Amino acid sequence: PDYEVIGRTMAELIFSHIPSFGSVVLCAGNPKWEQHARIVQGFEDYMQENGAQNRIYLDNSCCIGSEAQRNILKPDVAACCSVLSQGSVMLVQGLQQCGKAGKVFAVGSDVFEENLDALRNRILDNIVQKNPYAQGYLGIKALVEYLVQGKAPEQRTIYVGSEVVFRSNAVMYDRDNFRGLLL
């Protein structure tokens, strides 16, 4: 996927739902990992290009610690999101522990059962699905075509589209339906 576009999408979702003075907790993952850093960059680029002056509390931790809880509990926090699937689990736990579940706009990353449950239970408002299965499938397909047929990929980078999941379309991502979206 184009990770910067994913960051922009997350930012657009959030800033279309919160006031201009509301702060955002951004579970940013590991800044040394290119995917995480590019999502954060896209988020920041969207803010700059659209004149958003909202304060961002950046959290690079891998578990819900006291710093993350302090950020979530700040009275100015109107939204939160995570750039990685593990961070989404952490974020949901933090929102529940702090009593903020359903009170701030929250966006998670990737579709898996825990995130779908959080969406259905109104802890998460949206999930950005980065399609990891499709990423793996297309990567292996390109490799097999190269090794077996000698056919090099047409482009150096293969982009996989991302999708925004709402409660209204979550049924498409239920266990029985989800695999069918890959084909």
PLM feature spans:
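Hydrophobic alpha-helical segments within soluble ligand-binding/sensing domains
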Residues: 1-25, 65-69, 111-115, 131-148
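Short, solvent-exposed amphipathic alpha-helices that sit
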Residues: 6-10, 34-53, 68, 90-94, ...
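Short beta-strand->loop
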Residues: 25-34, 58-59
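Hydrophobic alpha-helical
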Residues: 43, 56-118
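Hinge/cleft segment of the Venus flytrap/periplasmic-binding protein
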Residues: 47, 131-183
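Conserved phosphoryl-transfer motifs of two-component systems
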Residues: 125-126
